[in-house]
Amino acid sequence: SDLQDILDLINDRYVEVPDMELVIKGGIQSALERSHPFNSWLNASDLSEEDPGGASAGMTLIKRGIYASVLTVVPGGPADRAGLRPGEVIRRLNGLSLNKISAWKMQRLTRGPEGTEIEVQRYPKDTVEPVKTILKLENIKFPPLGFQTSSRGSLITLSDLRAGRDKEFNTLLGRLSPNQPLILDLRNNSEGTMEVALNIANLLCSEGLFATLRSTNKPNVNLTLTPSNPRPSMKLIVLQDSSTSGVAELLASALKRHGKAKTWGSQTAGLGVALGRIPLSQGGALEIVMERWTGAGREEVDQTGVKADKPIKDFGPQDRLIDFILDTLNDTVQGSKAS
């Protein structure tokens, strides 16, 4: 085959004697990443490594070939306090170039024993020179859901969809003023479970399809909404952007389709997938995407994500967010009446 001919030519005619094992491994890893940035090839020595530890830098990275981008940061965590923000580019971790490692290995480098320091070479937004930042790993304490209210409406910030967030969210719903607009901020949200996302959707949506889970050589699995109460009558605004990822994308889609929500911001990440691990005969494994998701509005959230109804590039400072949204909403309503 052409592939074997290429390998033979590299081995026989390259200017220096190549390490063919590294050539082949790099080629396989590159092919896997082209299929999906979460895919990884793990060799036997990778699998024999001890767990790095439970402390974390408080950020989620997504590998993009020779670099990584920050997908989300945990509010109040080490990365957040150091000024890292979603969308920033990271080129090296502890001096190691990211083009030489898998997505699996990259994530492990951001974990370790509490107090461990890692060096991050990063490119903050709107800069051309790299900045080195030291992060000290911590056992992350996730803050409560953000909640702000005023006489005109309320804002709930969902920075993750971990276990228990659905109950916490339900409690906050009981504090809302009747018929006042609710702003649900799903930005900077990439962690959580399908169950929690579905439970929150059941609190705000009418009956219907929540998501379709697609796997190779298996029937599609449809998850449906089964709300115990009628859909609340409040006006619902969902904030989203490229840091809205995974199950948060399914929640945004369901709220848009069955909760009559309007989505503001920009398109979500398009990373609605689940990984699986396949053992290999020589002791290694493939960690690859084995399930892809479709949203309630038939969006392919594994690729294109959920589009925003109202594009907004800059929401302004966080402490003014609720006023900005409600002022914009009021201007939109007044403009519609005038027309």
Ranges and model annotations:
Residues D80, R85, N94-S97, W104-S281:
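Cleft-lining beta-strand/loop regions that shape enzyme active-site pockets
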Residues V301-D302, Q318-S339:
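Conserved functional hotspot residues or short segments at active or partner-binding sites
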Residues D51-R92, L96-I101, A163:
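PDZ/PDZ-like domain segments forming the peptide/carboxylate-binding groove
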Residues I90-R91, I118, V301:
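Generic structural signal for buried aliphatic residues
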Residues D12-L71, G115-E119, Y123-F147, S336-S339:
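Extended, small/polar residue-biased N-terminal targeting/export presequences
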Residues Q282-V289, W293:
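C-terminal "exit" segments of structured domains
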